[in-house]
From Swiss-Prot:
GO MF annotation list: quinone binding
Gene from which the chain derives: pqqD
Pfam families membership: PqqD
Keyword check for Metal-binding: no
Gene3D superfamilies for this protein: Coenzyme PQQ synthesis protein D (PqqD)
Family the entry assigns: Belongs to the PqqD family.
NCBIfam families listed in its UniProt record: PQQ_PqqD (TIGR03859), PRK02079.1 (NF002535)
Subunit structure, as described in the record: Monomer. Interacts with PqqE.
Pathway: Cofactor biosynthesis; pyrroloquinoline quinone biosynthesis
Functional description taken from the UniProt entry: Functions as a PqqA binding protein and presents PqqA to PqqE, in the pyrroloquinoline quinone (PQQ) biosynthetic pathway.
Origin species: Acinetobacter baumannii (strain SDF)
Domain of life according to the entry: Bacteria
Name of the protein this chain belongs to: PqqA binding protein
Keywords from the UniProt entry: PQQ biosynthesis
């Protein structure tokens, strides 16, 4: 799937064994999984906070625009994140 074909009606969910949380020792958001930990940058952490198995990608984009303003890059950043997270097997898109 590429950016042009991406369906923003898909709902991202964290895959079994992966947990998103704020880690004070890392001073940021991380994804924990059995083999280790992934420290996320600020943008990825902001996106990850809205992955709850209920919000579709379109709703996540809308919430981020409400939080940060209608920044043109938000749409592309969220879709890029979803594609990478799916490719890395952090999330499922249903």
């Amino acid at each position: 799937m590429n950016k042009e074909q991406f369906d923003v009606n898909l709902v991202p969910t964290w895959r079994q064994g992966y947990r998103f949380q704020f880690e004070p020792a890392q001073n940021g958001f991380v994804i924990l999984y059995p083999e280790g930990m992934i420290k996320l940058n600020e943008s990825a952490g902001a996106i990850g906070q809205y992955i709850d198995g209920k919000n579709n990608v379109s709703a996540i984009i809308a919430q981020l625009k409400q939080q940060f303003g209608d920044v043109a890059e938000i749409d592309n950043d969220v879709i890029d994140y979803m594609l990478v997270a799916q490719q890395q097997h952090w999330i499922d898109l249903v």
